[in-house]
Amino acid sequence: MKILSILGWSAGILAGLAACNVHQCVQAAAGPAEQPAGEYRVLEPIESGDLLLFPVVRANGAQPAETPFLTLDEGIRTGEVEATEAGRVRGLVRPRPRVGTVEQRGQDDRVFPEEFPERGDQVNTLVLVNHSDKPLLLLAGEIVTGGKQDRVIAKDRIVPAGSDPIDLGVFCIEPGRWTESSATFGAAAKGAAHSFMVQPSVRQNAMVDKDQRAVWDSVHGAIVQMNAAAAPAASGSLGGPRSVNAMNTTSYAKAMQDSAVSEKVDEAAAPVMKSRDQVLAQLRQEHAVGVVVAVRGEIVWADLFAGTDLLARYWTKLVRSYAAESLVPGESAATPTVADAQRFLSAPSGGTETSEGDVGVYRYRELRYGGTETFVLESLLPGTGYDVHIGKLKLIGAVRRIGAPQIYR
């Protein structure tokens, strides 16, 4: 990979809003501001079918000495992270010192936090607790399965180590089911090699539109396209060609787990995933911290992390989500260059800025300018004070899927 000396993109201009404790602050920025040169540089791309992945490095090679975060998949696998429906919060509450008489405490001698009164299950809220001794990093687009519906994380956030239960904003990606399949939620994939998150077009509806119906529409469209893409792969099997309704599911996660779909996703990602260790070794050597993503010649997304270690831990999950996006049919554009990818990163960030977070834990900002939107998750935990994840996307128009089942409308 060749490092080109081009003006880079800095997230530093995004600083300036004070953290807001569990509420949002919105302000109009003064206008587009040019980014300081040299913060990020784009490398020569890795080609994988209709995918083009441009690795991104910090110009000075500087990275945090350590990124002490636990990922969602790691936490669920070890049992250190639990997520459940809102109505089951009582079982997750941490023990409190015994206060009062037995009669005052009742049979359950744990004190139920006032912020979590008895309540029913909710489509767009789960309750999560981090039992580990590390802060938990959650990325928008990550999937948890089980409960009464599969869900997707709505926005990036950090959950402190040893936390009390928190309300977690989510979107349903399995319309039509509201019956419990399990008491707690699990990871979407059975193994790390097949991990995934929702593809960029679905992530956009969750992160930008923040609209459940839009998420359902995009899930429906993605499932239809997965079925269509998988049909040729299954046509040689006993029983003839595969129907576009062959999966018989409204769940995005179950669609991605379908063997024929998984085969197509792996095929789309093959040039990257077959040499995964070699690619990751090269990324580490170059001190890469993220990628700019182009699908069929159109630059659509960028994911940047605090360091190479975090990028490597999310690599499979990210690449398979990009590969799923490449299954969406469409016309191909001219192959973008390194300069095109650099311009995408270097585009001014201005317009309207929205900020929210948790004092002393994290700050999350959204900036929209022109045809792009940028999302920045900054850690405020002791010893950090840096951007943990930056997502940037090219806004695409929402398409209403005519003929979608009523549940998607």
Language-model-detected regions and their locations in the chain:
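Intrinsically disordered, low-complexity segments enriched in small/polar residues
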Residues: 20-135, 141-409
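Bacterial N-terminal signal peptides
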Residues: 8-19
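Positively charged n-region of N-terminal signal peptides that target proteins for export
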Residues: 1-6
